[in-house]
Amino acid sequence: IDDKAFTITTTEKYNPAWFINNQLNRLVPMPAHAWSKTSDSDKPGEKDRTPAGAKAIFKYLSAASEDLQNYDTNKLWKTTLGPFQLGKYTPNGKAKLVASPSYDGEDKASISSFTMQPYTSDDAEFNILRSGSIDYGFIPPNSMTQQKYIEKQGYTVKPWYGWSITYMPFNFNNPKSGPIFAQKYIRQAMQHLIDQEGISKIIWNRTASPTCGPVPQQPGTAGSSKGCAYDYNPAKAEKLLKDHGWNVTKDGITTCQQAGEGEGQCGKGIKQGAKLSFTVISQSGFTSTTHMFAELKSSFSNVGINLEIREVPDLSLIHISEPTRQAEI
């Protein structure tokens, strides 16, 4: 259409909402007029038109993104499409965003600037919120009982709903545990060990709702695991394992007793004596998440599935969870 807009015409008919939210959101437009270069002194051009050139640009941009000391002065990050642009940044993650004078969209900034302050944990953030030292924050699930106190401090408290679910992805590429995860009955048994109702009520203070699958509950509604194909039922989990050749050792580690691919055997790729012991990578800094995984570890141990919980910062979590890494869950 012009130098800032283009059209996409599909050869088939698609649901517009699905196409926009599930396909177009995977396209990330990048400012070639400012970023299509391979060094600070290089002038933007069309190097991105070739695979080799695109890789060189990506390498340069990646290196610049890791240079946190010069983040707020690097001209690369001054190029923005939204109502705000980076004003100040410190290596610990504190960032000040200022209104962009060149933004001509409908949703222009209504404030001149705002500062995003990082915290080491949700408890640390909540302590600052209690003191009234910040304008906007959140109440962690484990602190919901203090809502009235926060309101007396002058804050307005509203639910932070999201159309989302929480799940634990399996690393099927892991050479040790991948063949185990590939067995459907293993995944079924593990789901039978998750007490969604109890976790929702006790750990998340009803800020999270049980669900039966990948489609999230409507925000604000009380979900239930009743009617789910894989309800909380440790007895079913134990039976599934025993029926497939595992020596279930409660509060120990369950091992494969009958290796093989036949009926009553552990399954393809699972060796005799293989253990149901896995490392779970979890995001650090969230008390309720820590408590949830402690509950899962306890529940899974009832049928001899050992979970070693390893908490890491968010950025490390994303890196470790890549399919080629050795993470298990």
List the predicted regions and their residue ranges.
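Ligand-site clamp/hinge motif
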Residues: D72-K75, P101-Q147, G285, K297-S298, ...
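Periplasmic-binding protein-like
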Residues: T156-F172
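Ligand-binding "clamshell"
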Residues: Q146-P159, R325
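A structural "hinge/loop" feature
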Residues: A17-A32, L81, P169, P179-A182, ...
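Surface-exposed binding/hinge segments that line
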Residues: I1-S62
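Append "and occasionally in soluble cytosolic enzymes with long acidic Gly/Pro-rich linkers
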Residues: K96-P101, A182-S298
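Short, well-ordered beta-strand elements
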Residues: I8, G82-Q85, A95-K96, S112-Q117, ...
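Single conserved hydrophobic/aromatic residue that forms the stacking wall/gate
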Residues: I318-I329
